[in-house]
Amino acid sequence: MRAGTPRALAVAVLLEVDRGGRAQLLLDRALRRSPWPERDRAYATFLVYGALRRLRLLDHLLAPLLPRPEGLPPEVRWILRLGALEWLEGKPDHARVSPWVEEAKRRYPGLAGLVNAVLRRLAPREAPECVRLSLPDWLCEAWRGFFGDVAFAEGFNEPAPLFVTAYREVDLRPGPVPGSYLWEGPKTDFSALGLQPQNPASLFAAKLLEARPGERVLDLCGGAGLKAFYLAAQGAEVVSYDLNRRRQEAGARTARRLGLWVHYRTQDLTRPVPERAKKVLLDAPCTGTGTFRAHPELRYRLSPEDPARMAALQLQLLETAAQATEEGGVLVYSVCTLTEEEGEGVVRAFLARHPEFRPEPVQPPFPVLARGLGVYVDPRGGLDGFYYAKLRRVNSQA
């Protein structure tokens, strides 16, 4: 994917997102091939993420001016949305309209006049809250019913700060969790600096285990092992299980560069693991609604059935985690989503089946949306939305 300007690159990336691609991967790959100054790279990033985070609102603003938007070529629809995004951000007409008209001329010359007319006629328009937040109606209403309001979702439409977990001494601005820092420069070879990009809410899931030197810890659904890295840095003997061998191999390479040792084992975790431990972390696969800031396209790909479907899998995985937890041990369940079904719903169903487990208090060092058997993290301020539950096995009842 090659493009001559940040605007052209943004359109190209968004077209690939339309085809099912992931914005973060596509944009990172495109920027690696573009020898632009940081200002241009930052502007392309703003355009891609801004358009996806505000997509429903942008279409709402354009709707009175486009009676049949679905009849337009996808390139032109994205050009109009990106022009509307710049209008929404207060960019003046003289700096905003002409560049997008030129983009249209290069692709569809016959539609350049339409682009010019529409972008010059944009005007404020009241929008329902779910549209203003660019959330699907079904999820917006579910969150309103569960949390009481959806104001927290504005956090998903803010710029995403880059947090790193440090595995050596650094001179960076501290994040909200000890060991987490804010990275304010361009992306780089982080592991060479002893750093690992990781949201503080993700790091806190590993901290909940309170792993000590020499303790054996099982990291289930560990992926590349980001949480395992932190546990290993505490001196724990970490065994990280996942079904994706390729991600594990990439994680093992990163761990070596960070000077850490993690044992990786590849297995389907709907089946029991062949060992037990006093400390078990299950960071289960989920709908990912807490990561809408970093993965804004995800909100438009989920269906109302997805939370219940994922909850059924998560309950299966919790059964595996329970069998692997020794008496007196701790099982931490975490998901990077804010749905009732995948958080409180899963833990409630699990505890009904397993009276040998008791929930323990969880006190994150950042604001929470709701408390119950576990806690939901407020995604404002750069945090990912997470749910955590800390479960103690008080006896060996099966």
Swiss-Prot record:
Q: Which SUPFAM superfamilies match?
A: NusB-like (SSF48013), S-adenosyl-L-methionine-dependent methyltransferases (SSF53335)
PROSITE patterns, alphabetized:
SAM_MT_RSMB_NOP (PS51686)
Active site residues of this protein: C336
One GO process term, biological-process aspect = rRNA processing
InterPro entries linked to this entry: MeTrfase_RsmB-F_NOP2_cat, MeTrfase_RsmB-F_NOP2_dom, NusB-like_sf, NusB_RsmB_TIM44, RCMT, SAM-dependent_MTases_sf
- Signal peptide range equals none
Subcellular location per UniProt equals: Cytoplasm
Keyword Transit peptide present in the record's keywords: the answer is no
User: Which CDD domains does the entry mention?
Assistant: AdoMet_MTases
What are the record's GO terms for cellular component?
cytoplasm
Q: What residues form the membrane-spanning segments?
A: none
Does the record carry tRNA processing as a key word? no
Stored Pfam families? Methyltr_RsmB-F, NusB
Catalytic reaction list: cytidine(967) in 16S rRNA + S-adenosyl-L-methionine = 5-methylcytidine(967) in 16S rRNA + S-adenosyl-L-homocysteine + H(+)
Q: Where does S-adenosyl-L-methionine bind?
A: C221, G222, G223, A224, G225, L226, K227, D242, D268, D283
Q: Which GO terms describe its molecular function?
A: RNA binding; RNA methyltransferase activity
Summary of the function given for this chain in its UniProt record: Specifically methylates the cytosine at position 967 (m5C967) of 16S rRNA.
The text of the family note is: Belongs to the class I-like SAM-binding methyltransferase superfamily. RsmB/NOP family.
Q: What is this protein called?
A: Ribosomal RNA small subunit methyltransferase B
The record lists the organism as Thermus thermophilus (strain ATCC 27634 / DSM 579 / HB8)
